[in-house]
Amino acid sequence: RALASFTQYLDPALVLAYHTQGQLIYWNFDDIEVSGALALGREFARLSGYSLENTPYASGFAGYKDWFIKAFRRPGFTIEAGLGENPLPLEQFDTIYANNLGILTTAALGLPE
């Protein structure tokens, strides 16, 4: 509830939900295709080198990104950073940071109106 309330207060243009398995990006939820989300997801994939994937049905319905897309009808992304078993080794930090810096910068600069 706290995260939902905080998100409603901030009213963000998009959200990034970070997880740590797979070096991929999930961009959609339950047949809801938000305007501009696919193009932005493709840009995030290009910047990070991660693959862009549809959210698997079995993985949907429980995440922050899924709730955000449904509630706000705005772009939301789950970024699966890193490889291996959790907890990921600290040695992956520099690579994960380098792979995600472009995503973070692009998201922070905002969406074109």
Can you annotate each of these PLM segments?
Residues 1-113:
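Metallocarboxypeptidase
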